[in-house]
Amino acid sequence: MGENDPPAVEAPFSFRSLFGLDDLKISPVAPDADAVAAQILSLLPLKFFPIIVIGIIALILALAIGLGIHFDCSGKYRCRSSFKCIELIARCDGVSDCKDGEDEYRCVRVGGQNAVLQVFTAASWKTMCSDDWKGHYANVACAQLGFPSYVSSDNLRVSSLEGQFREEFVSIDHLLPDDKVTALHHSVYVREGCASGHVVTLQCTACGHRRGYSSRIVGGNMSLLSQWPWQASLQFQGYHLCGGSVITPLWIITAAHCVYDLYLPKSWTIQVGLVSLLDNPAPSHLVEKIVYHSKYKPKRLGNDIALMKLAGPLTFNEMIQPVCLPNSEENFPDGKVCWTSGWGATEDGAGDASPVLNHAAVPLISNKICNHRDVYGGIISPSMLCAGYLTGGVDSCQGDSGGPLVCQERRLWKLVGATSFGIGCAEVNKPGVYTRVTSFLDWIHEQMERDLKT
C-alpha cells in the first residue's frame, strides 16, 4: 500500500482469501450455474485445505532435503559455481565436472616452510618425488600457479619435511614424452615413498628482496625509497585511494572493498617505486582487469581480497620489486613482529592521507585474543588476522586499505596480510584487521592461471 492510499478495511478471515480462492473464475455450465459456482467456492477451502497444507509441508521438506544435499558436501568437492557435489577422486582428474572447469584448477601448490611441490590427485594432496623429475617440468608447475616462468627447482630430503608433507607421494610418469607433460596432475602416478629419498622444491618468481629497513601509520616512521619496493599506490581518477602489493610484473593484490562498485579498470592507475605522493616522477600504470572475490561480504568484510592486472608489465629495479606470496600451510606464529606500510592518515581523525609513505612494526595477534568480547567480540573469521598493539598507539589507518602486512622468513619478505578494516585508528583493544593471504592462495593462483591460459 502506498503512503497516499486510503487505509484498508479489515476483512473477516477466511481460508478462501488466504489461498486466493476468491479470485477463482468458474464458467457456468447449467441454468443454475451461479448457485453451483457459489456452492463450489464454499466447499473448496474445506476440501482442499488439508491437501494444500500437506503440499506446502512436502515442498518445504523437499527444499530442505535438496539444500542439505547440495550444501552438505562432506567428503566431496562442491562446485563453487553451482550446488553440484562431485567425488574428490573426480577433482583434478582431467575431466571438467564443474561449470567452467573449476575442478581442474587449483591442482598444484607449493607448501610449507620449504616450498615443497605438491599435486592434488587421487583425492588428496601428494608431495612430488624428485625421482624422474626434470628441470623443465618446473615451467609446467609454475604455469599452473599462474606464473609464466620459474626461477629454480631443487630437491630436499624427505626427512627434512614437516609431517603433513611426507605422508603421500607422486612421481612424474617416466613413460610420458616430455611434450605430453602439460599439466602435472595428468602426468603423475601415486607411490608409497620416494626411492631417491628426496622431494621437489620450487620457486616461481624472484621476490621478497629489498635494500635494508630502518613505528602506519599511526605511531609510524617515514619510509625510505626502496624500503618497501612492493608497495603500490592505487589511484582512482588520479587520487590515491588504497594501497596494494606487487606480486608479479602484472599483478597487484589489494582489498575487495577498495574496488567494490569501483571496478572499471579505466578509472584506475597504479604508481609504484615512490615514497611521496606529491611531485613524484613515478609513471602511472594503466589497469587492464580487476577481479574481486565472488564471496566478498561488504557488511562483514569477509573474503576482502582483490587482484588488479596491469595493462603492461612492470620493470623491476631497486625501487620496484615483488613481495613473495606465502606457501600453503605456512604458519606465522602469534607475536611475530611484522610490518605494515601505506599512505594512510598519521593521526586518528585526520582524514587525509599522508603525503609520504609510512611504516610500522606490528606483532601478530591470535584470532582467539582478537575475538575476545573486549576486542572484536567474535567477528574475526579464520580467513582474517589481527596485528598491532592492544594498548593502541600503532596501527594502519584510512588510506592504507589493501596495503601490505609483510613478515620476514628466511631472509625473504612474504605477504601475510592485506589491510582490511579496524575501529578507529590505533585505539585500545582495536588492532588492525587484515585479510589472511594464506586463506586465499588457491583463489589467487586460479585467477592468474586462468588469465595465463587466455
UniProtKB/Swiss-Prot annotation:
Gene Ontology molecular function terms on file: serine-type endopeptidase activity; sodium channel regulator activity
Broad class of the protein's primary localization: endoplasmic reticulum
Matches recorded under InterPro entries: LDL_receptor-like_sf, LDLR_class-A_CS, LDrepeatLR_classA_rpt, Peptidase_S1_PA, Peptidase_S1_PA_chymotrypsin, Peptidase_S1A, SRCR, SRCR-like_dom_sf
Cytoplasmic side: 1-48
Alphabetical list of SUPFAM superfamilies matching this protein: LDL receptor-like module (SSF57424), SRCR-like (SSF56487), Trypsin-like serine proteases (SSF50494)
Cell wall biogenesis/degradation listed as a keyword: no
UniProt cross-references to Pfam families, sorted A to Z: Ldl_recept_a, SRCR_2, Trypsin
Residue ranges of domain Peptidase S1 in the record: 217-449
Location of the protein in the cell: Endoplasmic reticulum membrane
Stated consequence of mutating residue 251 to C: In DFNB8; fails to undergo proteolytic cleavage and is unable to activate ENaC
This protein's GO CC annotations: endoplasmic reticulum; endoplasmic reticulum membrane; membrane; neuronal cell body
Disulfide bonds: 73-85, 79-98, 92-107, 129-194, 142-204, 207-324, 242-258, 338-407, 370-386, 397-425
Positions annotated as active site in the UniProt record: 257 (charge relay system), 304 (charge relay system), 401 (charge relay system)
Glycosylation: residue positions: 221
Annotated keywords: Autocatalytic cleavage, Deafness, Disease variant, Disulfide bond, Endoplasmic reticulum, Glycoprotein, Hydrolase, Membrane, Non-syndromic deafness, Protease, Serine protease, Signal-anchor, Transmembrane, Transmembrane helix, Zymogen
PROSITE patterns per record: LDLRA_1, LDLRA_2, SRCR_1, SRCR_2, TRYPSIN_DOM, TRYPSIN_HIS, TRYPSIN_SER
Stretches in topological domain Extracellular: 70-454
Post-translational modification: Undergoes autoproteolytic activation.
Any one GO biological process: sensory perception of sound
Phenotype for residue 401 to A: Fails to undergo proteolytic cleavage and is unable to activate ENaC
Site (Cleavage): 216-217
Residue intervals passing through the bilayer: 49-69
EC identifiers of the protein: 3.4.21.-
Task of the protein: Probable serine protease that plays a role in hearing. Acts as a permissive factor for cochlear hair cell survival and activation at the onset of hearing and is required for saccular hair cell survival. Activates ENaC (in vitro).
Protein name: Transmembrane protease serine 3
Organism field: Homo sapiens (Human)
Taxonomic lineage of the native organism: Eukaryota, Metazoa, Chordata, Craniata, Vertebrata
